[in-house]
Amino acid sequence: MMLPTIVEWSEPDQKILLEPYTYLGINTDKELPAMVTRAFNHWYQVPQPALDIILKIVGPIHVASLLIDDIQDDSDLRKGKPVAHTVYGVAQTINTATYVFFDAYRNISKLTPFLKSPEITDLGSIIDDEIMALHRGQGKDLYWRDSLICPTEEEYLRMIHNKTGAMFRLPIKLLQALSPVESLPDCFPLVNIIGILAQIQNDLLSLSREFTEDKGFCEDFSEGKFSFPIIHAIKADSSNSLLMDILRSRPKDEATKRKALRYMNDQTKSLDHAFKVIRKLEKIAKEEIEKLGGNPELSSIFELIHFSSTPEIDDQ
């Protein structure tokens, strides 16, 4: 028997392997983590070549995590089209997501020439720490969902500090390690606020009419997910089991989901509550930006994602 000779991994092979990833068609440069990273470089002044490498690490990891999220949430849509695992299968999608994680990780060695901080010699540990945080947060989220345990708002905020915050802290920690600026500002209170703000905004949007085209109608109910406004509604009246019963049944029909949405909007005012928390977080974030000396690009991002009012819902 003739053993195969060792050959280089070819471009056609790579293209096939990455199909579930490229299928999503996500422009990572326009995703919020990348936008925030570029804006924070106003303070860190990392050279453009190093910034580009950081974005090549963070962008793919972000998209790979979405591939896994869609499987774990049993989602139907992502960006308005069928999720990758319904097209390519669960096994291939998991394999692709894992491959993308490791492929992105390999870029970390390209940052070594730009290292400025003598205290940091292992950039890989930055990625390790935040990927661990992401999985810890996701683990809590899945545990609550599958055990039908409603967390408190405080517990939920701690969870998203890990799960969502990781994708914002990771690139900022890399910027910090590579920054030539001698007296660096402490940007991490602001980074953490942005992570929490982004998740609560997403939670509120997922119940809105605007989100239906991208992810389907009120998919958090179908996924049995304890989002920020859903948690508020459950805790607002623990004697009413409506939402817990609906989350347990994971409904697909719009009538049941509209019933839950009307209850949250009219009875517990949970959408208004989430909106007020968002406004409060926006105010705190803007104050932090001013403390750090201002940042026009970051301020522009806040204007872009700002909610002027509670998003319109479709509860009729």
From Swiss-Prot:
Cofactors, names only: Mg(2+)
Keywords, in A-Z order: Lyase, Magnesium, Metal-binding
Domain of life: Eukaryota
Bound cofactor: record note: Binds 2 Mg(2+) ions per subunit.
Gene3D superfamilies assigned to the protein according to its UniProt record, in alphabetical order: Farnesyl Diphosphate Synthase
Substrates-to-products reaction catalysed: (2E)-geranyl diphosphate + H2O = linalool + diphosphate; (2E,6E)-farnesyl diphosphate + H2O = (6E)-nerolidol + diphosphate
Known EC number: 4.2.3.-
EC class of the enzyme, as a word: lyase
Binding-site positions, Mg(2+) 2: 69, 73
GO MF terms held by the record: lyase activity; metal ion binding; prenyltransferase activity
SUPFAM superfamilies xref list: Terpenoid synthases
Residues binding Mg(2+) 1, per UniProt: 69, 73
Similarity-based family: Belongs to the FPP/GGPP synthase family.
Its biological purpose: Terpene synthase that shows monoterpene synthase activity and produces linalool, using geranyl diphosphate (GPP) as substrate. Also shows sesquiterpene synthase activity as it is able to convert farnesyl diphosphate (FPP) into (E)-nerolidol.
Misc remark: IDS-like terpene synthases originate from a geranylgeranyl diphosphate synthase (GGDPS) progenitor in fungi, after the split of Melampsora from other genera within the class of pucciniomycetes. They lack coupling activity and act as classical terpene synthases.
Name this polypeptide is given: IDS-like terpene synthase 2
Naturally occurring in which organism (per UniProt): Melampsora larici-populina (strain 98AG31 / pathotype 3-4-7) (Poplar leaf rust fungus)
